[in-house]
Regions:
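Structured catalytic-domain cores with a bias toward divalent-metal coordination
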Residues: 1-313
Length: 313
């Protein structure tokens, strides 16, 4: 059986900000998996736990896997996105600062490990009911696209490219990285979604010959950036479509009860959709990802050489 080597790093013991890195194996390639960069991350933490339990039962690993189940301990405990200590969102300050605030020092310590990894998988729990999907800079970088296309989830969605995000900064540094956003409520675990993501990641490890087992070739639809559908009136929103369904501009996706229909202004696929609830004018009730119908795996990316990879560590 493979035993985890635990490395506990104290960022700020007074606030309980200690990062626990669990390493399985010591060889290359290395995969870094992290979860809970914010509160409301119960499902992605559980998925990382399931991956660790699987690795512990293996006889050997040809490579190494490092797992950080809770990347932002204080925010995770409080169920918040922004730290109450410095008003910073961890996933907006990478690569961090060794001498900075608690959140910046946390990002710096994670970045130290991330910059040495061969692959990075960032687990997140969606704040709206969603299809579990990959988010990555797959249109800009072929090293990212190659990983995104090997994670056996239905969609790989182009990320926003926000600077300071781990997904953006690592991709710019030449590191193959994807985020996985999964179904789950803020304070409850969606065990089915956690298992689905665990299986997708374990299959990726098999494709890279890190662990043994049957390999499943993935079929991933690449999409552009997510588009939001907002409501223009207040009331009870009732969805009239299902997650994963294709939509065209003008299709009805739901209604504001006793008032009006909510239509999609975009073509694409429904990736996230609000359950029936009370909404206010301007609220986001769904997100649509436009399919890249003209994509061919053999095509080079125009911007692949526009940014030279540079490694800081």
């Amino acid at each position: 059986m493979v035993k985890a080597i635990v490395d506990a790093v104290d960022i700020d013991p007074k606030t309980g900000t200690t990062l626990g890195f669990y390493s399985f194996g010591e060889e290359r390639p290395n995969i870094l998996i992290l979860a809970a960069t914010e509160g409301g991350s119960a499902t992605d933490v559980y998925s990382s736990y399931l991956i660790m339990k699987h690795l512990e039962n293996l006889d050997r690993i040809d490579g190494s896997v490092t797992i950080l189940p809770v990347a932002n301990p204080l925010a995770f405990r409080l169920g918040v996105k922004v730290s109450p200590l410095d008003s910073k969102d961890l996933d907006s300050v990478f690569p961090g600062d060794e001498q900075g605030t608690i959140t910046e020092r946390t990002a710096w310590e994670i970045w130290r490990r991330a910059s040495q990894a061969d692959y990075i998988i960032h687990l997140k729990t969606g704040r709206q009911n969603c299809v579990s999907h990959v988010v990555a800079m797959h249109r800009e970088y072929i090293h990212v696209r190659n990983v995104a296309s090997q994670i056996a989830l239905p969609f790989a969605i182009e990320c926003s490219g926000q600077r300071g995000s781990l997904t953006t900064e690592a991709a710019h540094e030449g590191i193959p990285i994807v985020s996985i956003e999964m179904r789950g409520d803020i304070d409850q675990v969606d065990s089915q979604a956690a298992v689905e993501v665990r299986e997708a990641i374990l299959n990726f490890m098999r494709l890279k010959d890190i662990i043994s087992g049957d390999k499943i070739e993935s079929s991933v639809k690449l999409t552009g950036r997510m588009q939001h559908i907002n409501v223009d009136s207040e009331g009870f929103f009732v969805p009239r479509i299902h997650l994963g369904e294709p939509v065209q501009m003008g299709n009805v996706i739901g209604t504001i009860q006793d008032k009006n229909e909510v239509v999609s202004p975009f073509d694409g696929v429904i990736v996230s959709l609000s359950r029936m609830n009370y909404v206010f004018e301007g609220d986001i009730v769904a997100r649509v990802a436009p399919l890249l119908v003209d994509y061919r795996a053999s095509e080079p990316l125009d911007s692949e050489d526009s940014v030279q990879p540079r490694r800081k560590w």
